């Protein structure tokens, strides 16, 4: 892996799959305050083949927002949710279209103190509704609607 990339978290998923989240700073597009942030989630099969790598670049968070969410999957393997969240967000939940609520683990990094990273892999057949960020006290701070992402994914898979 490129030496500028920082591994944020890694783990395993069913079927012998492994995953990792990485991030790195990249030169900005001429902004005076410098760098942009790229973050990705990579899913690897037991033979070491990359099944999926997705995420995004740009500013760590857009002005006025507390979350930047990306989702996706490849032709095989689970569906991935990766979010960059403001440090005020202490807990993240994923809600399915059926109303089931799942905890999305949140990971910090000393290298990227302006954001934390939340990620979860779920079965690709699952229909999702939203990702919600909460304060330490449980107050809902921001909700990201997944309807567009899900409609596109399930129509084109």
Residue positions per predicted region:
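Ser/Thr-rich low-complexity repeats and stalk/linker segments
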Residues: 76-78, 88-157
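Short, well-ordered beta-strand segments enriched in hydrophobic/aromatic residues
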Residues: 80-84
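Solvent-exposed, non-transmembrane segments of extracytoplasmic/periplasmic domains
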Residues: 1-79, 97, 142-143, 147-152
């Amino acid at each position: 892996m490129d030496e500028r990339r920082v591994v944020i978290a890694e783990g395993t998923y069913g079927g012998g799959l492994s995953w990792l989240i990485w991030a790195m700073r990249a030169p900005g597009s001429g902004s005076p305050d410098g760098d942009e942030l790229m973050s990705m989630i990579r899913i690897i099969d037991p033979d070491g083949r990359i099944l999926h790598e997705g995420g995004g670049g740009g500013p760590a968070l857009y002005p006025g927002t507390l979350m930047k969410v990306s989702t996706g999957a490849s032709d095989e393997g689970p569906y991935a949710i990766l979010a960059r969240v403001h440090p005020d967000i202490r807990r993240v939940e994923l809600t399915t279209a059926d109303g089931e609520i799942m905890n999305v683990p949140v990971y910090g990094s000393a290298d990227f103190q302006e954001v934390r990273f939340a990620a979860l892999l779920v079965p690709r057949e699952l229909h999702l509704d939203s990702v919600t960020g909460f304060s330490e006290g449980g107050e809902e701070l921001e909700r990201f609607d997944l309807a567009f992402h899900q409609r596109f994914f399930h129509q084109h898979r």
